[in-house]
Amino acid sequence: MSARAYAGLAAAGLAALTVLSPAQAASNATKDEAIAMVKKAVAYIKDQGADKAYPEISSRNGQFIDRDLYIVVYQLDGVVLAHGGNAKFVGKDMKEMKDVDGKLFVKERIELAQKQPSFWQDYKFANPVDKKIEPKQMYCERLENTAVCGGIYKN
C-alpha cells in the first residue's frame, strides 16, 4: 500500500473515531449510579479522612469520576472542599453561584443539607462531556459539617 493510501485510510479512521466518540461516550449516569457514587465517597472520606479523600475526589483521573458523574463536597457555609468536575472551585465560597435561570443553587443545596440527611436538588449546569447547559439533578448526603454530592444530567 502506498504511503498516500495509508495516510488516507488513517485519516478516514480518525474521522470515524471522531464521529463515533460522542455515541461511544456511553449514556449519562443514572440516579442509582449517583447515589452509589455518593455513598462510596462518604465511605471513602470516613475511612481515609478528608486530607486524603478530597484530593482523590478532585482528581480528573480519580475513582470518583465516571462519564458525566463526579463528586463535589461542600462545607455547610458554601465553600467547596473537593470538586471532581472542576478543581478550580476548591477553596472558593460558591453560595452566591447562580444557574442560567438565576437560581442560587449552592445556597439552596447547603440549606437543604442543614435540614435533611439526604436529598435531591434540581438546577441547570454545564455537562462536562459536551459542555452544554442541561437540567441536572444532584443527590447529596450530609456528612458532619459537609454535603457530599453527585449529580446526573437529565438530557
Question: Which functions belong to the PLM regions below?
Answer:
Residues 2-155:
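N-terminal membrane-sensor/transducer module of prokaryotic signaling receptors
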